[in-house]
Swiss-Prot record:
<keyword id="KW-0479">Metal-binding</keyword>
<feature type="active site">
    <location>
        <position position="140"/>
    </location>
</feature>
<dbReference type="GO" id="GO:0008270">
    <property type="term" value="F:zinc ion binding"/>
</dbReference>
<dbReference type="GO" id="GO:0006508">
    <property type="term" value="P:proteolysis"/>
</dbReference>
<feature type="binding site">
    <location>
        <position position="222"/>
    </location>
    <ligand>
        <name>Zn(2+)</name>
    </ligand>
</feature>
<dbReference type="GO" id="GO:0004222">
    <property type="term" value="F:metalloendopeptidase activity"/>
</dbReference>
<dbReference type="InterPro" id="IPR050083">
    <property type="entry name" value="HtpX_protease"/>
</dbReference>
<keyword id="KW-0645">Protease</keyword>
<feature type="transmembrane region" description="Helical">
    <location>
        <begin position="34"/>
        <end position="54"/>
    </location>
</feature>
<feature type="transmembrane region" description="Helical">
    <location>
        <begin position="193"/>
        <end position="213"/>
    </location>
</feature>
<keyword id="KW-0482">Metalloprotease</keyword>
<dbReference type="Pfam" id="PF01435">
    <property type="entry name" value="Peptidase_M48"/>
</dbReference>
<dbReference type="InterPro" id="IPR001915">
    <property type="entry name" value="Peptidase_M48"/>
</dbReference>
<feature type="binding site">
    <location>
        <position position="143"/>
    </location>
    <ligand>
        <name>Zn(2+)</name>
    </ligand>
</feature>
<protein>
    <recommendedName>
        <fullName>Protease HtpX</fullName>
        <ecNumber>3.4.24.-</ecNumber>
    </recommendedName>
</protein>
<keyword id="KW-0472">Membrane</keyword>
<dbReference type="GO" id="GO:0005886">
    <property type="term" value="C:plasma membrane"/>
</dbReference>
Amino acid sequence: MMRIALFLITNLAVMLVFGLVLSLTGIQSSSVQGLMIMAGLFGFGGAFVSLLMSKWMALRSVGGEVIEQPRNETERWLVETVRTQSQQAGIAMPQVAIYHAPDINAFATGARRDASLVAVSTGLLQNMSRDEAEAVIAHEISHIANGDMVTMTLVQGIVNTFVIFVSRLIAQVVSGFLSGNRDEGESSNGNPLVYFAVATVLELVFGILASIITMWFSRYREFHADAGSAKLVGREKMIAALQRLKTSYEPQEESSMMAFCINGKSKSFSELFMSHPPLDKRIEALRSGDYLK
């Protein structure tokens, strides 16, 4: 209920900001051109703001702590492993962080390849062998080297723009029709309450459907990150790491972080809405070498 309330409040706030921006620029939001500009600004704007704040948001969501100076042998090994692999991948040394969680997991994020972050859970450090942990770290380094965070942001921006544009275009037609504004030359949002209600419902529906696209891309990049890890540390180490993930607790990270973690949630009514492929499929892809070519 709280999430729905926050969504409605956010949606109303966005619409108010839309109106202010468009009135200041003289663009009519009821025109197709104005609606497209509005959708693009906020569709890509929100995605890129999230990207720019990704390191701060990620650390805050998991309670992660950046290693400024290694305090023990495990932290020294972790930092040196990240340093070695980042040099092999041709990227700048990422920040390294640890967060407390019982599940075996890790993630990478950051707005640029040369200003990134790699974080691992205490569950990973406690339950994986060094070879397995090396493979997981190499997987995250591969995400950074492949520029996955930026590409994911572009995909999300396109999806956001489409959802906002189509939802509000249909809402204009419906609210105008119900308000009696059927003249071809008339441009109006009709009843504001009807417009808001229809736009909100459609954004929810189209947002769920559009997530199929973003989740497909997320699964696709996981296969390539697995292959990147295999190239850095060896195929058998990566396969062993994925097999170890089968014994892990269900990931505890927030849903907003799942696409950036190596271990995604397995409980979903459909694979279409999963950010990660099933572990068995990832292992089979490595064994067949489909993404190593």
